Amino acid sequence: MIGRLQGILLEKQPPEILLNVQGVGYELLLPMTSFYDLPEIGQETTLFTHLVVREDAHLLFGFAQKTDRTLFRELIKTNGVGPKLALAILSAMSVEQFAYAIEREELSKLTKIPGVGKKTAERLLVELKGKFKGIKQSDFFVESTHIPLSPSIESHSESSSDEAISALIALGYKPAEAEKMVKRVAKPELTSEQVIREALKAAL
């Protein structure tokens, strides 16, 4: 199994990237919380990975931190949570935010994530509560301050908004809902990654 990849970032179109590892291009799906940490196109990056084998496809998921992958693996063990839903959960919340929501039994916050209904949220609480006791409350809701203004992504409002809407749809949001979320936060100076981040933050 592929557990870790180190290579040159060739393309990034949230939530997908193309990574060149010694001449081989790997397509990976990343949660947005990991996507924000990516370097500029053409630079080297290292990602922890998880391979999902299905009858119709092999899907490779990438994560900036090992803790993100660990939570992803815990999520897909939960009945009713597949890889795509786990990706949506990790895109909407950091590991710390998710842990905080679980420990405080914040069902309403979990059900705001696309694809997470009341029953799924209740299952997550039952199966994952108590697994995050080592995390301090002061660690929760830490703002990321290192999202670069990437010249590889159009900074024009229309282009950034279109890319952000496409990414949100890929994460499970309905087209009309994704468009509404983006319009609420879009600004001309923001990259698509920043628009996605602000839209997801505002949705919770």
UniProtKB/Swiss-Prot annotation:
Matches recorded under SUPFAM superfamilies: DNA helicase RuvA subunit, C-terminal domain, Nucleic acid-binding proteins, RuvA domain 2-like
What is the stated purpose of this protein? The RuvA-RuvB-RuvC complex processes Holliday junction (HJ) DNA during genetic recombination and DNA repair, while the RuvA-RuvB complex plays an important role in the rescue of blocked DNA replication forks via replication fork reversal (RFR). RuvA specifically binds to HJ cruciform DNA, conferring on it an open structure. The RuvB hexamer acts as an ATP-dependent pump, pulling dsDNA into and through the RuvAB complex. HJ branch migration allows RuvC to scan DNA until it finds its consensus sequence, where it cleaves and resolves the cruciform DNA.
Q: Name one GO molecular function term.
A: ATP binding
- State the family named in the UniProt similarity comment for this chain: Belongs to the RuvA family.
Ranges where the record places region Domain II: 65-143
Which cell locations does it reside in?
Cytoplasm
Q: What is the lineage of its organism?
A: Bacteria, Pseudomonadati, Pseudomonadota, Gammaproteobacteria, Pasteurellales
Query: Which parts of this chain are annotated as the region Domain I?
Result: 1-64
Q: Which GO terms describe its biological process?
A: DNA recombination; DNA repair
Identify the keywords attached in UniProt to this record, alphabetized: Cytoplasm, DNA damage, DNA recombination, DNA repair, DNA-binding
Location (main, coarse): cytoplasm
**Alphabetized InterPro entries for the sequence:** DNA_helicase_Holl-junc_RuvA_I (IPR013849), Hlx-hairpin-Hlx_DNA-bd_motif (IPR003583), NA-bd_OB-fold (IPR012340), RuvA (IPR000085), RuvA_2-like (IPR010994), RuvA_C (IPR011114), RuvA_C_sf (IPR036267)
Subunit structure and binding partners:
Homotetramer. Forms an RuvA(8)-RuvB(12)-Holliday junction (HJ) complex. HJ DNA is sandwiched between 2 RuvA tetramers; dsDNA enters through RuvA and exits via RuvB. An RuvB hexamer assembles on each DNA strand where it exits the tetramer. Each RuvB hexamer is contacted by two RuvA subunits (via domain III) on 2 adjacent RuvB subunits; this complex drives branch migration. In the full resolvosome a probable DNA-RuvA(4)-RuvB(12)-RuvC(2) complex forms which resolves the HJ.
What is the protein name for this chain?
A: Holliday junction branch migration complex subunit RuvA
Q: Which Gene3D superfamilies match?
A: 5' to 3' exonuclease, C-terminal subdomain (1.10.150.20), DNA helicase RuvA subunit, C-terminal domain (1.10.8.10), Nucleic acid-binding proteins (2.40.50.140)
Q: Where is this region: Flexible linker?
A: 144-155
Region annotated Domain III sits at 156-204
